[in-house]
Amino acid sequence: MKFFVDTADTQAIAELNDLGMVDGVTTNPSLILKSGRDIIEVTKEICGIVSGPVSAEVVALEAEAMIAEGRKLAEIAENITVKLPLTWDGLKACKTLSDEGKMVNVTLCFSANQALLAAKAGASFISPFIGRLDDMSLDGCELIEDIRTIYDNYGFGTEILAASIRTVNHVQQVALIGADVMTAPPEVIQKLASHPLTDKGLQQFMSDWEKTGQKIL
């Protein structure tokens, strides 16, 4: 499963990328606001850090304006993925931009039917939001499973990009289900390496090693 990092923080992206943990990046208007930077400037910098897909989101609501913004964003770098909302206008823009050879990430997906429409419109990625469904006492991971089944049934090439990942358990669940990609904030990715028994075991090893009085270097 590919790891995308969900942030516009270039330092955090670079640190994870140096570890080989970043296959791509996703951004949205909220993350651009949090960065306090110009969207074109920060997106261009991100595209220079990672070689994989970098999702940059349009802010228009009508198809023609979405298409124009998508073309503008795609000029930033070859690895730009134009991010579009899952609306009829977004699907129309998806069809046009994908026909032009541009990568498209259709976002804000909350149902398998929506994911089916995005695949038929030629989306490169579909982004189902797990955490927001969980907030409504629904099973976000069940949605990932349903989309996986539909895409496999009909041979769609659209990649499932599990989004709104909030916990390490979410990461494990979507990996078991078979999501192609997951995108998560840097802090969630950092937590994947943590386990209390690892810490406890390391502490015991260090204590015992100190008692030997030996050194390696």
UniProtKB/Swiss-Prot annotation:
InterPro entries with a match to the protein in the record: Aldolase_TIM, TAL/FSA, Transaldolase_3B, Transaldolase_3B/F6P_aldolase, Transaldolase_AS, TSA/FSA_arc/bac
Function text: Transaldolase is important for the balance of metabolites in the pentose-phosphate pathway.
Pfam families: TAL_FSA
Listed GO CC annotations: cytoplasm
GO biological process: carbohydrate metabolic process; pentose-phosphate shunt
Catalytic activity annotation: D-sedoheptulose 7-phosphate + D-glyceraldehyde 3-phosphate = D-erythrose 4-phosphate + beta-D-fructose 6-phosphate
One of the record's GO molecular function terms: aldehyde-lyase activity
Alphabetical list of NCBIfam families matching this protein: fsa_talC_mipB (TIGR00875)
Stretch forming the signal peptide: none
Stated family: Belongs to the transaldolase family. Type 3B subfamily.
Keywords, comma-separated and alphabetical: Cytoplasm, Pentose shunt, Schiff base, Transferase
Positions annotated as active site in the UniProt record: 83 (schiff-base intermediate with substrate)
Gene that this sequence comes from: tal
EC number of the protein: 2.2.1.2
Protein name (record): Probable transaldolase
Recorded metabolic or biological pathway in which this protein acts: Carbohydrate degradation; pentose phosphate pathway; D-glyceraldehyde 3-phosphate and beta-D-fructose 6-phosphate from D-ribose 5-phosphate and D-xylulose 5-phosphate (non-oxidative stage): step 2/3
Matching HAMAP family: Transaldolase_3b (MF_00494)
Compartments, as annotated in UniProt: Cytoplasm
